[in-house]
Amino acid sequence: MMKIAATLLATIALATVNALDNGLALTPQMGWSSWNFYACNINESVIMNTAKAMVSNGMADAGYTYVNIDDCWAGGRYPNGTVYADPTNFPNGIKYVADYIHSLGLKIGIYTDAGTETCQKRVGSYGYEANDAQTYAEWGIDYVKEDWCYATLENPQQRYQIMSQALNATGRPMFFSLCDWGYENPWTFGMSVGNSWRTTPDIKDNWDSMLSNLMAQAPITSFSGIGGFNDPDMMMVGNGGMSNTEYVSHFSLWSLLNAPLIAGCDLIDIDQETLSILTASEVIAINQDPLGVQGSLVKSYNGGLQQIWAKPLSNGARAVVLFNTDTNPATIELLWGNIWMEPSQQLSIRNLWTQTNLGTFTESYESDSLIPPHGCIMLTLTPTN
């Protein structure tokens, strides 16, 4: 038991040092981004109506705070270097949109690039970091995502440090999201310059892409913690490329990983099943647990076809996802040793998706029904004493 406790304490300690001290990212960020569904087809109406929908459909009440404008908003720069919005799609400017979003009690995010151009060839922030940061502050921006297109000859830690310092110098707290797609191991330096850092290439709306981005997190869980989080990319839940069973697994695992919960579907015309996944309160609570420890892969069976992912919670409980990656149904057995518990410990188990208590167990728990192909069961296990 002492060895198990020492391992757990070491994980927590590694996850809470060297954080960028801007007072943000005490828990993973939650919100919505325009890219996955709209790509470049954005305008002020889309952004403002999405924000309005987040309030009316319960997303805001569930914790989704940020409304993030991704690439294609920028129109260019004035002669003095100040960036301005595309006058066709954002005729009233970004501050107008920001003021509206703030009036709803939400926050606004903006996109830029560490290179000379963004990925869609709009103006990047290279050499204009201080100018852009001040402009964002004047607009009332709360969140900045900085991409890595046309910056590949640069050192990402140094380049991102420039924008990080520029944002902090404005005096306005702005969440800083780094995005070099994991190419230069940003988890090794991200905590010192940003609040989250992409660890993978862009996610696609299919099973293989989601699974690939998930598995890329397994070796780097100790680099995430309060103040800065590993980012396996925005969620694809609701975009139609996967089944709802797969989307439940996607959302469960992103929640357990302390990944940013950034929705990427159409929230204006969202279906009820997608909304119920994205607003699952007991699942979201695992992501937002204040202990801030990222979940990790603790056990695999059958060559990785069945997996157990787990994380400790602030109340002494454990959150667990029993994950079946196989194309056939399966049962999965969880041993207490897998989750840093003594075999004799009595644990009360709750299913977070059905919101039902399953009883009290010692030593182990085996799923009482077959887990469907690409499906999961998400549990909390709480000591009875």
Swiss-Prot record:
Pfam families referenced in this protein's UniProt entry, alphabetically: Melibiase_2 (PF16499), Melibiase_C (PF17801)
Top-level taxon of the source organism: Eukaryota
Top EC class of this enzyme: hydrolase
Enzyme Commission designation: 3.2.1.22
Catalytic activity as recorded in UniProt: Hydrolysis of terminal, non-reducing alpha-D-galactose residues in alpha-D-galactosides, including galactose oligosaccharides, galactomannans and galactolipids
Organism whose genome encodes this protein: Dictyostelium discoideum (Social amoeba)
Binding site for substrate: 180-184
CDD domains: GH27 (cd14792)
Keyword Hydrolase appears in the UniProt entry: yes
Entry-linked SUPFAM superfamilies: (Trans)glycosidases (SSF51445), Glycosyl hydrolase domain (SSF51011)
Coiled coil: none
Signal peptide region: 1-19
GO biological process, one term: carbohydrate metabolic process
Assigned keywords, A-Z: Carbohydrate metabolism, Disulfide bond, Glycosidase, Hydrolase, Signal
GO-annotated molecular function: alpha-galactosidase activity
Protein name per the record: Probable alpha-galactosidase
Disulfide bonds: 40-72, 119-149
Enzyme active site: 147, 202
Similarity annotation: Belongs to the glycosyl hydrolase 27 family.
